[in-house]
Structures are given as C-alpha cells and as structure tokens.
C-alpha cells in the first residue's frame, strides 16, 4: 500500500486545496494530510490563521480524497513525516518551507527516502486562494456587520 503525505495550512478551503489533495491521492492508496498548527503558521506568515487548527483539520479530513488529517508538530516540522514514513510526499505550489532537494537531505538523516512531488498547478477560477477570498469579503463587507 502506497502512503502519500501532503501538508498545508488549509485556512479557508478553496478549489485549489481540493485539486491539490485530489492529485496527491491519485499517487497512492492512502492520503494523510498534515495540517499546520496555528502557532507554526503565525511564526511563518506573521499572522494566525482565520480558522482554528482543529476546525481546519476536521474540514480537511472531511474531504473525499483524504483518508486522515492530523495536526503538525509544534517542535519539529518533520516529526509527523518521520512517524508516518510515507512513500510519497506532495508539496503544494506555494510551499517553500523546504525545497525538494533540501527535504530529501533532511529526511535522509532519518533513513527515509520518499519520492517528493510538487503539484505546480494553480487552479484558474474565482477565489482560487484564501487571500483572494479574504480580499473579496473585505471588499463586499468591509466595516459592515
């Protein structure tokens, strides 16, 4: 059985997230998704996610391609990958915490050598990113309750 792992913030789900996860699932039999912790997102992006981590995890796990969604580690971002021992890791188009080669080198230290695949497709549709959704909400409802 081929285990695939994908990770992300998944703050305000949109079609791009779904296409990313559908692609990831197509590469194997089991898809486990690591959802970034609120504190991790705040450290990387300089702001907390809009949707709390447990709600984001539950929403991701409810998606058809996803077999299981877990929260990432607060200590070591590689910890869940080390525990899961995936055959394939799928990176999203905007994931830059690691590049493919750096990730391979880091995982080699733990005797892991999964195939690393980058999903480079941006979905061309209205509201294809969380940022675009937030901008539209502010435009439509900015200052209004």
From Swiss-Prot:
The keyword Cytoplasm does not apply. GO terms for molecular function: ATP binding; FMN adenylyltransferase activity. Its cofactor is a divalent metal cation. It catalyses: FMN + ATP + H(+) = FAD + diphosphate. ATP binds at residues 9-10, 14-17, 94, 122. Transmembrane segments: none annotated. GO terms for biological process: FAD biosynthetic process; FMN metabolic process. Keywords: ATP-binding, FAD, Flavoprotein, FMN, Nucleotide-binding, Nucleotidyltransferase, Transferase. SUPFAM superfamilies: Nucleotidylyl transferase (SSF52374). NCBIfam families: cyt_tran_rel. PANTHER family: FAD SYNTHASE. Homodimer. This is FAD synthase. It comes from Methanocaldococcus infernus (strain DSM 11812 / JCM 15783 / ME).
């Amino acid at each position: 059985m081929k285990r695939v792992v994908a990770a992300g913030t998944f703050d305000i789900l949109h079609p791009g997230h779904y296409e990313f996860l559908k692609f990831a699932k197509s590469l194997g039999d089991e898809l486990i998704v690591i959802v970034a912790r609120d504190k991790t997102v705040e450290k990387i992006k300089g702001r907390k996610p809009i949707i709390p981590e447990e709600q984001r995890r539950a929403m991701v796990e409810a998606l058809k391609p996803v077999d299981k969604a877990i929260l990432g580690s607060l200590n070591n971002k590689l910890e869940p990958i080390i525990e899961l021992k995936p055959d394939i890791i799928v990176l999203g188009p905007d994931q830059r915490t690691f590049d493919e080669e750096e990730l391979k080198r880091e995982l080699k230290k733990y005797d892991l050598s999964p195939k690393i695949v980058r999903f480079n497709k941006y979905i061309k549709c209205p509201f294809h990113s969380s940022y675009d959704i937030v901008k539209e909400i502010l435009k439509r409802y900015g200052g209004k309750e």
